[in-house]
Amino acid sequence: MLRKWMPLTMTMILLLVGAAACQKAITTDQSNTTEETMRMTTQEKMDIFLTRRSIRKYKPELPSQELLDKVLEAGTYAPSAMGKQSVTIVAVTNRAVRDQLSQLANKARGGDADQFYGAPAVFVVLADKSLSSNYLQDGALVVGNMQNAAHALGLGTCWINAAKGIFELEEGQALLKEWGLEGDLVGGACCIIGYPDESHETAPRKDRYVIHVD
């Protein structure tokens, strides 16, 4: 009887061993695929930072509110000194207000061109200096977050250094009141945003940009 069952038993053992080997091969292949995907994802994430450019020519179409909200959300999660969150972002998509801000920028800086390079929307970054002595740094971090998020979503941005001058004007102060904003607010930046209508290569990085002290 034992001899009768031995061939069947050996067959079952061989089948089990073969199945285990196949499963190991599948698991190994899946592991390799996952590692490869992770490497690609890491590089893609890095490319967001390495390929972002300042855009100074835009298509007239206004991006969807969904896209703009994602960029704004990224801005709200920027670091702030001691977690004070001294920054307020005013998202301007109203064309008349956008044009008014451009005119005020011309008045503050001198000039008569569109200070916003045709971008259909402007994110005004304000900071309350009564909340933090690092309000300017807080604002810079918010703009950086929004610029990188916008690039990741296929949008273009440019930092326009006009907000301080705009909101030192009487007309700028009147806008703050109209928007219901209070506090010791200072204009940090105007981050223009829209669909890019240009592309350009990265300028070479300067020598000794990074100094290592090991």
Where is each model-derived feature located?
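Acidic, surface-exposed loops and disordered segments
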Residues: 2-10, 14-214
